Amino acid sequence: MLGFLSASLVKTPYKPPVKREPISLDRFILLKGMPAGLSLLLLSIPYGMTTNYVAMYAREIGIHTQTGFFFTFMAIGMAISRIFSGKLVDRGKITQVIATGLNLVIISFFLLASCVYLIQWNDAACTILFFGIALLMGIGFGIMFPAFNTLFVNLAPNNQRGTATSTYLTSWDVGIGIGMLTGG
């Protein structure tokens, strides 16, 4: 009761209501970034598949080492990529950085598919290749995804940077979700 009484004694100046813009799609999605968003979504699908199902894939083809190290090597690759990719993006080579990352990821997926055949000839070499693939994949994804974020922010005017980041994260999350659903 005392709180209500105290609050009723507070006087504030009148402020006229602020006219708000109607809610529209362009407040949540950067329309100018939709082509890049589609590209990012498509690139996130194999990432979602890999991070969720690579351990089962390794066990199925006969790799018997601790497949959890795959993610350790992938994280090391992502850390390595940050050493040089940020400098290249700062120099304006965003699309070249994305293309390089894409090529590394494509190569790593072809190598990952070849493990099915390589393990029949040499188990140790296949295991080493498996972890090398994780390192290469980490470098590729570690190069691509931060460059995509910079691309989205650069496409947006200053007052829509939050919208640009929202578009980036939505594309990323939807791609990973599709990858998890379709990969299993």
Q: Which role does the model predict for each range below?
A:
Residues 75-83, 176-177:
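Residue-level signature of mid-helix packing/kink "hotspots" within the transmembrane helices
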Residues 64-65, 158-168:
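Loop-to-transmembrane helix entry/capping segments in MFS-fold secondary transporters
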Residues 1-17:
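C-terminal membrane-cytosol helix-exit motif in multi-pass small-molecule transporters
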Residues 81-94:
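Helix-to-loop junctions at the C-terminal end of transmembrane segments
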Residues 69-78, 172:
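Transmembrane alpha-helical segments of major facilitator superfamily
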Residues 55, 178-184:
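Small-residue (Gly/Pro/Ala) motifs that create kinks and tight helix-helix packing interfaces
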Residues 93-148:
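C-terminal transmembrane helical hairpin of 12-TM major facilitator-type secondary transporters
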Residues 33-71:
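Extracytoplasmic gate region of multi-pass secondary transporters
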